[in-house]
């Protein structure tokens, strides 16, 4: 846990018994937001939002249905959006690399276009005095930061450009399941001042609050 400001429960890829039971409300005590990095059943997300008492923000993974096929009730999509609520400014991109033609799979070129759209919205918000996101949320990792060499689990180079341009304190992703020796060393990587965390399963984190958030506490907006 980082000695910072806003307590967040981040989840991804694996349904965990500790979060899918009567003890969730006490386990998530003090959590101000839940962030899902994808590939979780909608009913699981709906359970977590109900019993944690915190808003849930999500992106879709390569095993999630396409956007037109529905969405988890009560949850807020981050895909290509910036959502600000209290001490959080969240930006997100759904999907993994294209490998089988399924939903939420993108080539590097396609993800670059999606990242450009998101980056333009971030810049527009910054010009309006709303500051940049303190958390980026994706399903796939950035290229070379916690990814693997196979086509499915290779990260996106477009994400590196987002890190270099916007310098978020924290980048959360899932997709790459953690197992085998050295798991702890593979969960957290970094690029510059950005800490990149693979939240596969779950992680409780404390997120740095952006300077502009203190003036808009309790508000919620999206671009």
Tell where the protein language model's regions lie, with residue ranges.
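Binuclear metal-dependent phosphoesterase catalytic core
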Residues: 1-5, 22, 82-86, 162-165, ...
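N-terminal active-site segment of His-dependent metallophosphoesterases
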Residues: 1-51, 128-132
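Active-site neighborhood of phospho(di)ester-bond hydrolases with catalytic His/Asp-centered motifs
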Residues: 10-12, 33-39, 57-62, 78, ...
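Active-site environment of divalent metal-dependent phosphoester hydrolases
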Residues: 15-19, 40-46, 62-69, 98-102, ...
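A generic local structural motif
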Residues: 19-25, 42-46, 76-78, 120-124, ...
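Short, structured coil segments at secondary-structure junctions
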Residues: 51-52, 72-73, 192-194
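A short, gly/pro- and small-residue-rich
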Residues: 52-63, 156-159
């Amino acid at each position: 846990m980082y000695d910072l400001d806003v307590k967040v429960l981040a989840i991804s890829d694996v349904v965990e018994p500790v979060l899918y039971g009567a003890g969730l409300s006490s386990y998530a005590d003090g959590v101000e937001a839940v962030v899902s990095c994808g590939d979780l059943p909608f009913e699981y997300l709906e359970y977590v939002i109900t019993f944690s008492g915190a808003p849930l923000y999500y992106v879709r993974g390569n095993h999630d249905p396409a956007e037109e096929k529905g969405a988890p009730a009560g949850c807020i999509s981050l895909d290509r959006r910036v959502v600000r609520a209290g001490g959080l400014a969240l930006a997100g991109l759904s999907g993994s690399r294209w490998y089988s033609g399924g939903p939420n799979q993108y080539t590097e070129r396609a993800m670059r276009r999606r990242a450009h759209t998101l980056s333009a919205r971030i810049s527009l918000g910054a010009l309006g005095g709303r500051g940049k996101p303190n958390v980026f949320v994706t399903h796939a990792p950035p290229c070379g930061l916690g990814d693997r060499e196979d086509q499915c689990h290779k990260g996106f180079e477009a994400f590196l450009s987002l890190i270099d341009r916007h310098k978020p304190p924290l980048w959360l992703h899932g997709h790459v399941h953690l197992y085998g020796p050295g798991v702890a060393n593979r969960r957290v990587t970094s690029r510059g001042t950005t800490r990149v965390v693979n939240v596969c399963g779950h992680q409780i984190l404390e997120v740095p609050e952006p300077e502009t958030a203190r003036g808009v506490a309790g508000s919620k907006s999206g671009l």
